[in-house]
C-alpha cells in the first residue's frame, strides 16, 4: 500500500510538471493559478537568437533562475503578429540580435502565441485580448515574485502584437516603462475603443511607427490613426520605398488574396527594420518632424526642431508626452541604413509677363563641403509669375555644408506646338534652403545677379551668399 501511495504521489508531481511546461502552473504562493496561460515566454540568448531554448514559466520560480534571467537589467518583450505559416517570421531573430547588440546585459523575451496567431484574421484579432492578458499576468508575476521593477520593461509589438502589447500594458499592476508599436494592425482596430487596442494610456511612454496605412480607414493593413504619445509616419506612412506596389496589385488581381501575406510584408515589416536600424546605427539616428499633415510636410513646412518639434526615430526617441498625440513624418532610403537628410527649398519666381504652368518637373543639384547630390527630381503642382513656392527634397548622403546648387526646368513629357517658337522662362534671384538635420538656413544667390530659368534649357547656377536674415533662428 505504501509503495502504491508513493507511486501516486510521484505520478501527481510528474503530471504537474508536464502541465507547467504546456503553458502554466498552479502557483503555490497565494493560490495563484497560471494553468490557463497559453502563451509561452522564451528568454533567448545572444548566442542563439533564433531558437526558444529556455522558457520562463509563470508560477515556476526555478524557470527564471534556470534561464539565467538578469534581475538588474532591462527586459524587452517581443510580441509577433498574425501568421499564415504558424512559424516565426525571419525578422524575429534579427530584432533579438539587434537588441542584444545594443543592450548586451538585457533580457530579450519572445512571446509565442503562434497557434492563436495562425487562425483566420478576425479570430486571431480577437485573441489579442487573451494574449495581452497572458503577458500582463506574466509581467505581474515577475514583479510580485521577484520584485522586478516594471520601469525596466519595454514591450515591442508588431501588427496584431502591438495591440496585444497595449492590452497587456493596460492590465499590469503598474505601468511598464515603454511600448513600441510596430505598424499596429488596422482591420478590426481602426475604430476600436482604447481598452481593446494600443493607446497612450498603456505605458509610461508609447511610440508608434506607421509604415503601411494605404487604403481607406479600417481596410488598411496598418492602423491609420495615432495611438501613441508619438506616432511616426515614414514616407507618409502609406507605402515604403523599395516596395513595389504595382507588382503587388498585379499579383492580387491574378491570384487573389492568397499571397497577400507575402505582398504586405515589405511595407508592413519596414516598421521593424526601421527600429532595428535605430539599434544598430545609434550614431546616426533618423529624424522625424512634427507636422499637421503629410501634405504640409511635402512642402517642407515642418522642418523645425523648436519645442520638441523633431525627434529621433526608434530606440533613442525622446519621450515627449503631450496632451495630444504628436504626428511626425520623415523620408527614408529604400534599405538600411534608412537615414536621409531633409531640406526645405523656397523659390520666388518672377518675370515681366504673367505666366502659369501646371505640374512642372524640375531637377535640383546640391553641392557641399563633403559630397554632392545631383539631379534630384521634384514636381511643382503649379508655377506662376510673382509667387513663392516651398517644397521638400532629401539626399541619401551627407553632403556637409551647402556651397552651391543648380536648378533645371525639365521639358514636358509630351510635345506642345508652342515649344517650336518659344520656351517659358522665369527670373530667380535667390533660393532659400533650410536643412532639417542641422537646422541651418542658407541663402543662395544667382551667380549672375539674376538667373533666367528657361524650360528645357541649361540649369541655372546659384552660390551661397550672405544675407542678414541668415542670423535669424527658427
Curated annotation (Swiss-Prot):
Residues 417-421 are annotated as: Important for interaction with lipoprotein particles. Its EC number is 3.1.1.34, 3.1.1.32. It holds the Pfam family Lipase. The apolipoprotein APOC2 acts as a coactivator of LPL activity. Ca(2+) binding promotes protein stability and formation of the active homodimer. Interaction with GPIHBP1 protects LPL against inactivation by ANGPTL4. Keywords: Calcium, Cell membrane, Chylomicron, Disulfide bond, Extracellular matrix, Glycoprotein, Heparin-binding, Hydrolase, Lipid degradation, Lipid metabolism, Membrane, Metal-binding, Nitration, Secreted, Signal, VLDL. The active site is at residues 159, 183, 268. GO terms for biological process: cellular response to fatty acid; cellular response to nutrient; cholesterol homeostasis; chylomicron remodeling; fatty acid biosynthetic process; fatty acid metabolic process; high-density lipoprotein particle remodeling; lipid catabolic process. It is a peripheral membrane protein. It is found in: Cell membrane; Secreted; Secreted, Extracellular space, Extracellular matrix. GO terms for molecular function: apolipoprotein binding; calcium ion binding; heparan sulfate proteoglycan binding; heparin binding; lipoprotein lipase activity; lipoprotein particle binding; phospholipase A1 activity; protein homodimerization activity. Residues 243-266 are annotated as: Essential for determining substrate specificity. Homodimer. Interacts with GPIHBP1 with 1:1 stoichiometry. Interacts with APOC2; the interaction activates LPL activity in the presence of lipids. Interaction with heparan sulfate proteoglycans is required to protect LPL against loss of activity. Associates with lipoprotein particles in blood plasma. Interacts with LMF1 and SEL1L; interaction with SEL1L is required to prevent aggregation of newly synthesized LPL in the endoplasmic reticulum (ER), and for normal export of LPL from the ER to the extracellular space. This is Lipoprotein lipase. It comes from Rattus norvegicus (Rat). The gene is Lpl.
Amino acid at each position: 500500500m505504501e509503495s502504491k501511495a508513493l507511486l501516486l504521489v510521484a505520478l501527481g508531481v510528474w503530471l504537474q510538471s508536464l502541465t507547467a511546461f504546456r503553458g502554466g502552473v498552479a502557483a503555490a504562493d497565494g493560490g495563484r493559478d497560471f494553468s490557463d496561460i497559453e502563451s509561452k515566454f522564451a528568454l533567448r540568448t545572444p548566442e542563439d537568437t533564433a531558437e526558444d531554448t529556455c522558457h520562463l514559466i509563470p508560477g515556476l520560480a526555478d524557470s527564471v533562475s534556470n534561464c539565467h534571467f538578469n534581475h538588474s537589467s532591462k527586459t524587452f518583450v517581443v510580441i509577433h503578429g498574425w501568421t499564415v505559416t504558424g512559424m516565426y517570421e525571419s525578422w524575429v531573430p534579427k530584432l533579438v540580435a539587434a537588441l542584444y547588440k545594443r543592450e548586451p546585459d538585457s533580457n530579450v523575451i519572445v512571446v509565442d502565441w503562434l497557434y492563436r496567431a495562425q487562425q483566420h484574421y478576425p479570430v486571431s484579432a480577437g485573441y489579442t485580448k487573451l494574449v495581452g492578458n497572458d503577458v500582463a499576468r506574466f509581467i505581474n508575476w515577475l514583479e510580485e515574485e521577484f520584485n522586478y521593477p516594471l520601469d525596466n520593461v519595454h514591450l515591442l509589438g508588431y501588427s496584431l502584437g502591438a495591440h496585444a502589447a497595449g492590452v497587456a500594458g493596460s492590465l499590469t499592476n503598474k505601468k511598464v516603462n515603454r511600448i513600441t508599436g510596430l505598424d499596429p494592425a488596422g482591420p478590426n482596430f481602426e475604430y476600436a475603443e482604447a481598452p481593446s487596442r494600443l493607446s497612450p494610456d498603456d505605458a509610461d511612454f508609447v511610440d508608434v511607427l506607421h509604415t503601411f496605412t494605404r487604403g481607406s480607414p479600417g481596410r488598411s493593413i496598418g492602423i491609420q490613426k495615432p495611438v501613441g504619445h508619438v506616432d511616426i509616419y515614414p514616407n507618409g506612412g502609406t507605402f515604403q520605398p523599395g516596395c513595389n506596389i504595382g507588382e503587388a496589385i498585379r499579383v492580387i488581381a491574378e491570384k487573389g488574396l492568397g499571397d497577400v501575406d507575402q505582398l504586405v510584408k515589405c511595407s508592413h515589416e519596414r516598421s521593424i527594420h526601421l527600429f532595428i536600424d535605430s539599434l544598430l546605427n545609434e550614431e546616426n539616428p533618423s529624424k522625424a518632424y512634427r507636422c499637421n499633415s503629410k501634405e504640409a510636410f511635402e512642402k517642407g513646412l515642418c522642418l523645425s526642431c523648436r519645442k520638441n518639434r523633431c525627434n529621433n526615430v526608434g530606440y533613442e526617441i525622446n519621450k515627449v508626452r503631450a496632451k495630444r498625440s504628436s504626428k511626425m513624418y520623415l523620408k527614408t532610403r529604400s534599405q538600411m541604413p534608412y537615414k536621409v537628410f531633409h531640406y526645405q527649398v523656397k523659390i520666388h519666381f518672377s518675370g515681366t509677363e504673367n505666366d502659369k504652368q501646371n505640374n512642372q518637373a524640375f531637377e535640383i543639384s546640391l553641392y557641399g563641403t563633403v559630397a554632392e547630390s545631383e539631379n534630384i527630381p521634384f514636381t511643382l503642382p503649379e508655377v506662376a509669375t510673382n509667387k513663392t513656392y516651398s517644397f521638400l527634397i532629401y539626399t541619401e548622403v551627407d553632403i556637409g555644408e551647402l556651397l552651391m546648387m543648380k536648378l533645371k526646368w525639365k521639358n514636358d513629357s509630351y510635345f506642345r506646338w508652342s515649344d517650336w517658337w518659344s520656351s517659358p522662362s522665369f527670373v530667380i534671384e535667390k533660393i532659400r534652403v533650410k536643412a532639417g538635420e542641422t537646422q541651418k538656413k542658407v541663402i543662395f544667390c544667382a551667380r549672375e545677379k539674376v538667373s533666367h530659368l528657361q524650360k528645357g534649357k541649361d540649369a541655372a547656377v546659384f552660390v551661397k551668399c550672405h544675407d542678414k536674415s541668415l542670423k535669424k533662428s527658427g
